[in-house]
């Protein structure tokens, strides 16, 4: 099957840029990069797969896998006695019913997705396989297979390991410790602090590897639990080997950029302050622009609540970075108000704490608050351009 090197939706402009780059010979390095990615061998992490399969067959909710439908309670709310005569009570009841039904559909879709990825992993259990890549209109490379891939969710990343192994060496062993801290969620500290975090939790790491479902389940408290479990298995095997630095590892150590769109603005504009905010400049510990935006949002919410703003009063507690992260990231790509509202609503529902009938209004208020703050920061990054 012939697949284009770049994904675009019938855009004549994008096609013309691509043709111009090809005519000038500028695509050869790009093709070489895509060839490297496409020729990288992959395997399924058998230890992680066995835990995933046992958890799936039990039907219990674990990590980000919802429980099976027979173990979930999707009880509809009780009808208020005044439902027919009180429009407000009726509206609230309808919104809560919609929330329950939406949760049921969402969990069913999630289980279907997990089941599909598990079956793909099962089919490749004993094989080495490859993931052909192409790129989007921005030049970002992605695997062509849309499901089980190293750019997928936590489960996908936890299930995948490189098809070839290499000795860790001193640097590799340290990075394995740092990776453990990163996937656990301790990623805003210096590299040395992150390495010490993993060393301090060595007993928990061993317990997670030896008894993932019967032990203290430390790995389940991680931000990325399946990647954490994979790292527990790998780090345990390395540290228990005769020479940890000589241990041959195949575990991918993921690294991620900070708000790539704003990184481009900072680089194009030669903006040192902006570069520091998105980790293009060296620093003792990572900067976190998402927490910075969340802090400003919380200041606005507090001021609005003090002034008796009805929408602000719907927000019961401080907004965390996770609520604003996706909206901040997509501001530079032109996210609309409706898109931002939907992004925030999804996070509010996942977090809980806000009644279903208030989610729409609360997410609309937060979108109106977050977008201008993100845009102001974007403009600051562009001021020297």
Residue ranges of model-derived segments:
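Non-catalytic nucleic-acid-binding interfaces of large nucleic-acid enzymes and RNP effectors
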Residues: 1-328, 332-385
């Amino acid at each position: 099957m012939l697949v284009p090197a770049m994904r675009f939706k019938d855009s004549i402009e994008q096609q013309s840029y691509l043709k111009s780059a090809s005519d000038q010979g500028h695509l050869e390095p790009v093709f070489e990069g895509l060839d490297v990615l496409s020729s990288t061998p992959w395997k399924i992490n058998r230890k992680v797969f066995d835990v995933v399969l046992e958890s799936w067959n039990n039907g219990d909710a674990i990590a980000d896998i919802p429980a099976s439908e027979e173990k979930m309670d999707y009880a509809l709310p009780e009808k208020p006695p005044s439902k027919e005569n009180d429009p407000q009570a009726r509206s609230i009841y309808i919104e809560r019913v919609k929330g329950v039904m939406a949760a049921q559909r969402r969990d069913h879709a999630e289980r279907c997705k997990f089941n599909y990825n598990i079956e793909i992993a099962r089919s490749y259990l004993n094989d080495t396989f490859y993931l052909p890549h192409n790129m989007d209109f921005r030049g970002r490379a992605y695997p062509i297979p849309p499901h089980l891939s190293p750019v997928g969710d936590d489960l996908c990343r936890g299930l995948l390991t490189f098809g070839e192994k290499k000795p860790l060496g001193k640097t590799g062993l340290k990075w394995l410790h740092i990776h453990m801290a990163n996937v656990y969620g301790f990623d805003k500290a210096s590299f040395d602090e992150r390495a010490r975090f993993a060393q301090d939790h060595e007993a928990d790491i061993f317990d997670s590897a030896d008894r993932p479902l019967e032990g203290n389940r430390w790995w389940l408290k991680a931000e990325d639990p399946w990647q954490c479990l994979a790292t527990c298995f790998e780090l345990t095997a390395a540290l228990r080997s005769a020479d940890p630095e000589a241990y041959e590892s195949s575990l991918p150590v993921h690294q991620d950029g900070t708000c790539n769109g704003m990184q481009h603005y900072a680089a194009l504009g030669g903006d040192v302050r902006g570069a520091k905010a998105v980790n293009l400049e060296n620093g003792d510990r990572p900067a976190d622009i998402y927490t910075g935006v969340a802090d400003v949002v919380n200041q606005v919410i507090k001021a609005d609540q003090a002034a008796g703003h009805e929408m602000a009063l719907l927000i019961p507690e401080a907004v965390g970075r996770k609520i604003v992260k996706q909206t901040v990231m997509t501001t530079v790509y032109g996210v609309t108000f409706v898109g931002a509202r939907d992004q925030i609503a999804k996070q509010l529902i996942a977090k809980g704490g806000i009644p279903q009938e208030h989610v729409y209004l609360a997410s609309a208020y937060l979108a109106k608050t977050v977008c201008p703050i993100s845009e102001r920061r974007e403009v600051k990054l562009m001021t020297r351009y």
